[in-house]
UniProtKB/Swiss-Prot annotation:
The gene is ileS. Pfam families: Anticodon_1 (PF08264), tRNA-synt_1 (PF00133), zf-FPG_IleRS (PF06827). A motif ('HIGH' region) lies at residues 68-78. InterPro entries: aa-tRNA-synth_I_CS, aa-tRNA-synth_Ia, Anticodon_Ile_BEm, Ile-tRNA-ligase, Ile-tRNA-ligase_type1, Ile-tRNA_ligase, M/V/L/I-tRNA-synth_anticd-bd, Rossmann-like_a/b/a_fold. This is Isoleucine--tRNA ligase. It catalyses: tRNA(Ile) + L-isoleucine + ATP = L-isoleucyl-tRNA(Ile) + AMP + diphosphate.
């Protein structure tokens, strides 16, 4: 069915020139690759960026940057982290806080050292000493920092880029020595022989935070029989009493302790076996009259594994087994059963634990209790040493296990061998297995201040709240912190050792002196200068007696000292910091190392609040990896890839919008489909801003500003809605719920503005006389909306916000959107009763639009103006709201007909004939009819009274009056 005016003769004349059409230089396309750098240059030239925060008069806000490692290209994890921080800093700046964001870099450690070595030829490596290695590492780190810094700047991140903190700077190294010194003088630093996580691939000790635990590691597990040589009388007596047929000699000549281990290479280091005093154990006998000892709860499992029929002889508690002796499996000596702890369970194995104090923490602790030797059978390369006997020279990660298994098999001590899948610690850098190895190391004694650290955790706000439980459990259960490393690229432990002796020289005088030297000359002097030049004057006479230590500090001690090297040192910052914000893996990393050092030195946490985020995954929730080909590069998101169709240049703001769109408290996906969706949202916001800017091109706020009660009801509602949205977005920023900002922004731009207010405003803006009140009042509202919209989005869409601000067509007091400050509104703009009426009318409008859309889908009509609407109300509240609008509304703006963009609307008591469509719903009966009258060629409304226009055109009286016809 065709529309009623389809047969009418149309004129070629157009009234377009008489309309107030959109005019703005704010382009529909962002052209981000060119425009964003221009905006960044504008900020830099006008000191808008981080200096703006310094000039604020409010309280200081310190978000302390967790330093990324100065190695490698930037990835989506960097983007998530740095943009989150920047959103917060920009918001706080707009709120008037003194904000000074100091970006940092973690510069020491093995990855950089390995990169330097990889870049050298073999002959260069041979001639390389520690000092020259450090020089090359410094140069490498600076290059990496410069590359990463340029990337961060391109993302729109504000910070003190001219003065970042680097852990390789003299001032930082000096402050770190100060932290170490205070911990030592407080009694929290000691040197001792103790098993530590050791990486044969890196040839250094590792802290817990430097480990990762893949779930799919396979170990060669073995069940071994250890021949019993001596049994306490009370155990023998019990056995013989309960088994009269077995003589005492049988227990000593043909009985065995059964152990299980996943590290066969540690068998030569065995010094004891341990039992749990609370567990019940059984002596059993097999068909060959051999007697075995293992946990009672494992009887069925072991019988099945060994494929043997065992008979239980008698049962004893673990506490009764102490001092049973056995023949060492590889050495000519006897060892004994000792009492262990709750780490011995019956979940797997035999309930009896092979104990090598030099190669396990629990083993070491039991060894200390029983004064067992701490035998270390492995060198720094992972090769078995002379203490392993005939196995010397084999490698624990290669052939040692096989050699020892074959040996045990030959001695008829091997009961069973099988592969065992479990979580196992790997070196996070080399991705190779680690081992436990007893070496002389420096430790921070966490026991000395654990209770203070736990109290400090309680004093901090953790977001999400689960972070508190996570770090609390880690600190409760952690052992002492091994802080020494056997590498050159790091901050040295400032200790001197007596030549040919065990005495060390480390005291307050030494520490203060080294700290002063490092402050002036840097840590390189430790390798460059002789001992006499490093010692204080009082020790010069005995300088020949001492030699420098060669260990450096754990890089987690480096970054964990940043509160002292940065927050305490810089007057623009606060200690404790207001906020630490990093990935959730930092509960075992930077959050924890910073907490431990700060509590040990100052008995307080280094932060007031800790916020964590998840990891960036691909669209399918998989970890990104080159092998999977699913790596998303933030640089390609911004600048585009080689194929601009498949990898378009979205710009930094779309990257930032992604950060604001996700629930970052968990792992977050990113990929091409998500980017397309975000680009659509970005475009909608931009087009909304463009429409607002384009329709205020001739508006002057100095001439046409209005009080709220002078405005039509629709405009009053719009300003009230602006206040609501601003409040909601403020709350989202304050609570760090940026995905709420994303949702509110979308709804405001699409639902409130594009689909409602701006849709209705078209007639007011385009058709009205330029200076007519109905147009100027709308422009007044739009100016308020666009100014405040620019501010509200600026923490996230900083480039778009500035672009909007630069295209506001009238003079503003502020050169930049960031100088505007956070929106403050008149209380008079809030009107709850008005809100309820408008909500009722919007609900009715939605239902009427559905009915009109039904006509359009059937091709009965084209535009909504070709219709008129009859409404038979059922809903009392909607009817009341229509009466309210009729009574209090402005007749030029607040006619519900104009809100519907139809040619006529009326409330009726019965429905007319000749309906195009009738829709019945809970609000009432909605009848859509063809509009009566003729179409005005200028405004397209249908009117009964039409006058002749130019060149056979038709005009309504309103339009004729506007163009003076």
């Amino acid at each position: 069915m065709k529309s009623q005016n389809s047969k009418e003769q149309k004129s070629e004349f157009s009234y377009k020139e008489t309309l107030n059409l959109l005019k703005t230089d704010f382009s529909m396309r962002a052209n981000s690759v060119l425009r964003e750098p221009e905006i960044q240059d504008f900020w830099a030239k006008n000191n808008i960026d981080f200096e703006l925060g310094l000039n604020n008069s409010g309280k200081t806000f310190t978000l302390h940057d967790g330093p990324p490692y100065a190695n490698g290209s930037l990835h989506m994890g960097h983007a998530l982290n740095k943009v989150l921080k920047d959103i917060i800093n920009k918001y706080k700046t707009l709120k008037g806080f003194k904000v000074h964001y100091v970006p940092g870099w973690d510069c020491h450690g093995l990855p950089i050292e390995l990169k330097v070595l990889q870049n050298l030829k073999s002959h260069e490596r041979k001639n390389l000493n520690s000092l020259s290695l450090r020089k090359k590492a410094t140069d490498y780190a600076h290059k990496q920092i410069n590359n990463q810094m340029e990337g961060f700047k391109r993302w729109g991140i504000w910070g003190d880029w001219d003065n970042p903190y680097l852990t390789l700077k003299k001032s930082y190294e000096s402050a770190q020595i100060g932290v170490f010194g205070k911990m030592f003088l407080n009694g929290y630093i000691y040197r001792g022989l103790k098993p530590v996580h050791w990486s044969p691939s890196s040839r250094t000790a590792l802290a817990e935070a430097e480990l990762e635990y893949p779930d799919d590691h396979y170990s060669k597990s073995i069940y071994v029989s250890l021949k019993i040589t001596k049994v306490p009388d009370k155990v023998l007596l019990k056995g013989c009493q309960e088994n009269p047929n077995i003589k005492k000699e049988s227990f000593l000549g043909n009985s065995f302790i059964t152990i299980w281990t996943t590290t066969p290479w540690t068998i030569p280091a065995n010094e004891a076996v341990a039992v749990n005093p609370k567990i019940s154990y059984v002596f059993v006998i097999d068909e060959d009259k051999r007697i075995f000892l293992f946990a009672k709860n494992l009887f069925s499992e072991i019988s099945e594994k060994f494929n043997k029929i065992f008979k239980i002889l008698f049962e004893v508690k673990g506490s009764s087994l102490e001092n049973i002796e056995y023949q060492h499996p590889t050495k000519n000596k006897n060892c004994r059963i000792v009492i262990g702890g709750d780490y011995i369970t019956t979940e797997s194995g035999t309930g009896i634990v092979h104990t090598a104090p030099g190669h396990g923490i629990d083993d070491f602790n039991v060894g200390q209790k029983y004064d067992l030797p701490i035998t270390c059978v492995v060198d720094e390369k992972g090769n078995l040493n002379e203490y392993s006997g005939q196995f010397k020279g084999s490698n624990v990660l290669k052939d040692s296990n096989d050699l020892i298994i074959e040996y045990l098999k030959g001695k008829n001590l091997l009961l069973l061998q099988e592969n065992y899948k479990h979580r196992y610690p790997y070196d996070w850098r080399t991705k190779k297995p680690t081992i436990f190895r007893a070496t002389e190391q420096w430790f921070a004694s966490v026991d000395g201040f654990r209770s203070s650290a736990l109290k400090a955790i309680e004093d901090v706000e953790w977001m999400p709240a689960t972070g508190k439980k996570r770090i609390y459990s880690m600190v409760v259960g952690r052992g002492d912190w091994c802080i020494s490393r056997q590498r050159s690229w790091g901050v040295p432990i400032p200790v001197f050792y007596k030549k040919n002796g065990n005495e060390i020289l480390l005291n307050s005088e030494i520490i203060n002196h080294i700290q002063e030297l490092f402050s002036e000359y840097g840590a390189d002097i430790w390798w460059d200068w002789e001992v006499k030049n490093l010692l204080p004057e009082n020790y010069l006479k005995e300088s020949d007696l001492w030699e420098k230590g060669t260990d450096t500090m754990d890089v987690w001690f480096d970054s964990g000292s940043s509160w002292a090297a940065v927050c305490e040192q810089r007057s623009e910052l606060k200690y404790p910091a207001d906020l630490y914000l990093e990935g959730s893996d930092q509960h075992r990393g930077w959050f924890q190392s910073s907490l431990l050092t700060s509590v040990a030195v100052n008995n307080k946490p280094p932060y007031k609040r800790v916020l964590t985020h998840g990891f960036a995954l691909d669209e399918n929730g998989r970890k990104m990896s080159k092998s999977l080909g699913n790596v998303v590069d933030p640089n390609i998101i911004i600048n585009g890839g080689n194929n601009k169709k498949s990898e378009p240049a979205y710009g930094a703001d779309v990257l930032r919008l992604w950060v604001s769109s996700v629930d970052y408290s968990v792992d977050v996906p990113i990929g091409s489909n998500i980017l397309k969706q975000l680009s659509d949202v970005y475009r909608k916001v931009r087009n909304t801003a463009r429409y607002l800017l384009g329709n205020i091109h001739d508006y002057d706020p100095n001439i046409d500003s209005f009080e709220i009660d002078q405005l039509p009801l629709l405009d009053q509602w719009m300003l009230g809605r602006l206040v609501e949205v601003s409040s909601q977005i403020s709350h989202a920023y304050e609570s760090y719920e940026f995905s709420r900002f994303f949702q509110i922004l979308q709804s405001f731009c699409v639902v409130d503005l594009s689909n409602f207010y701006l849709d209705i405003a078209k007639d007011r803006l385009y058709v009205s006389a330029k200076s007519q009140f109905r147009r100027r009042s709308c422009q007044f509202v739009m100016s308020k909306v666009v100014e405040n919209l620019a501010v509200l989005i600026s923490p996230v869409l900083c480039h778009m916000a500035e672009d909007i601000w630069q295209n506001i067509p009238y003079l503003t007091k502020e050169k930049s959107v960031f100088q505007r400050g956070w929106p403050i509104f008149s209380q008079s703009w809030k009107n709850e009763s008005l809100n309820q009426h408008i909500t009722n009318l919007r609900n009715l409008r939605v239902e009427i639009n559905k009915a009109i859309e039904g006509c359009r889908n059937k091709q009965i009509i084209g535009a909504a103006l070709e219709t008129e609407v009859n409404y038979l109300p059922k809903d009392k509240f909607v009817k009341d709201s229509l009466n309210w609008l009729r009574k209090f509304g402005n007749e030029d703006v607040d006619l519900f007909r104009d809100w519907l963009i139809v040619s006529n609307f009326q409330v009726v008591s019965y429905l007319a004939e000749n309906s195009l469509i009738i829709d019945s719903n809970e609000l009432g009966e909605i009848q859509i009819l063809k509009a009566r009258g003729l179409k005005c060629d200028r405004c397209w409304h249908y009117q009964k009274e039409i006058v002749s226009g130019i060149q056979n055109t038709k005009l309504c009286k309103r339009c004729a009056k506007i163009i003076n016809l």
